UniProtKB/Swiss-Prot annotation:
GO cellular component: cytoplasm; small ribosomal subunit
Family: Belongs to the universal ribosomal protein uS14 family.
Record gene name: rpsN
Purpose of the protein: Binds 16S rRNA, required for the assembly of 30S particles and may also be responsible for determining the conformation of the 16S rRNA at the A site.
UniProt keyword Kinase, yes or no: no
Family matches, as NCBIfam families: PRK08881.1 (NF006477)
Keywords: Ribonucleoprotein, Ribosomal protein, RNA-binding, rRNA-binding
An annotated GO BP: translation
Keyword flag Transcription: no
Species for this entry: Leuconostoc mesenteroides subsp. mesenteroides (strain ATCC 8293 / DSM 20343 / BCRC 11652 / CCM 1803 / JCM 6124 / NCDO 523 / NBRC 100496 / NCIMB 8023 / NCTC 12954 / NRRL B-1118 / 37Y)
Single GO molecular function: rRNA binding
Assembly description: Part of the 30S ribosomal subunit. Contacts proteins S3 and S10.
Alphabetized Pfam families for the sequence: Ribosomal_S14
Protein's recorded name: Small ribosomal subunit protein uS14
Amino acid sequence: MAKKSKIAKAQKREALVAKYADKRAALKAAGDYIGLAALPKDSSPVRVHNRDWIDGRPHAYMREFGMSRLNFRQLAHKGQIPGVRKASW
């Protein structure tokens, strides 16, 4: 499990990205790069890192399911992920 402070920081970044999205798009369209540089660094969508929605783990993230491989494996073995079956060939 990720530290609570790291999860909170990631949520704060996501909120900043959402808050400045329209302003950032307008500045980009106008080509105002000085104005873009004046915005907070954390308002850039590039700085948002995908995290597991269960425990906040940042590594081994599976986009399709929104969780890390560890939690995916655990839930898949329990049969709690719809459409996922153990492979057999």
